[in-house]
Amino acid sequence: MQSRSKLDRFLWSLQQLMKIDAMNLVILVIFVLIGWSLISDNIANPARYLPSPIAVALSSVDMLVKGLLPSYFSDTLLRLIIGSAIGLAAGIPFGLLLGLNRTVADMFHPMLNFFQSVSGIAIFPIVVIWYGNSDTTVLIVILYTSIFPIAFNVLSGVREIPLRYINAARTLGASRFQVMKDVLFPGAMPHIATGSRLSIGFAWRAVIAGEMLAGRQGLGWMIFTGQDSDKTTEIILGMVIIGFTWIILDHYLLRPLEERTIERWGLVQR
């Protein structure tokens, strides 16, 4: 009953937070639209440099009717889901395995930090040399940008677990797998939650950049072809969709999951 009550309180708090965030977002959007319209109405050749919100809205309707916008959006979202899922599925166990040995963990920690700091855009040229302009290239870059942040965060979390907990488990006869499952994994859960949010954020940027540079479909490709054909409305439409999609994913899915995970594992005051 107590856990049920906590869940109910969490869901209620989440609902209130979503209402407040949604209200703030609406107010912000209204101000942005007003400013955007004023600038567009007072510049030369707005159709080329900064189309009005109405022009962008009409462009979105046209692309919806033609079926292009749903196709581009679903392609991008599918790449994000596949790339992030594989990256998390590989990065979390990798970080935990490295954490089984404290010496190995200390050795690999700077290496993971190094690869995490090298952006996916930086490795694009060499991946294009290997695989050309293809979906494989885009997927590899998404994997690269998502796997190292989560592995680094997991390993950082494991390194913060007191050695006495690990030694106590081994003294009681726990196998390496049991130590990883019963000690390292629970102890690193807050870092796993934070790392997952960070990893998916990097993957979202990577999929857009990948589609622009090496893809043939998706929102990134829509922006790239818009620039190529001088269709500024499509470029701005793509930017708006990218921004709002991430706001929805981060504020209404990833952040609540992260906060709930941290609260569940007792690292904040309840």
Language model regions located:
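Transmembrane-helix boundary motif in ABC transporter permease subunits
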Residues: I82-L112
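Transmembrane alpha-helices
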Residues: I140, Y144, R176-G210, T233, ...
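Short cytoplasmic-facing helical segments at TM-TM junctions of multi-pass membrane proteins
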Residues: N153-G195, I223
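Hydrophobic alpha-helical transmembrane segments of polytopic membrane proteins
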Residues: L219-L257
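Short hydrophobic, aromatic-rich alpha-helical segments embedded in or entering the lipid bilayer
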Residues: P51-V61, V65, W204, A214-Q227
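Generic hydrophobic transmembrane alpha-helix motif, especially the helices
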Residues: N113-P149, S156-G157
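Transmembrane alpha-helical segments of polytopic membrane transport and secretion proteins
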Residues: M1-I30, L253-R270
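Periplasmic/extracellular loop-to-transmembrane helix junction in inner-membrane transport proteins
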Residues: R9-M18, D41-A85
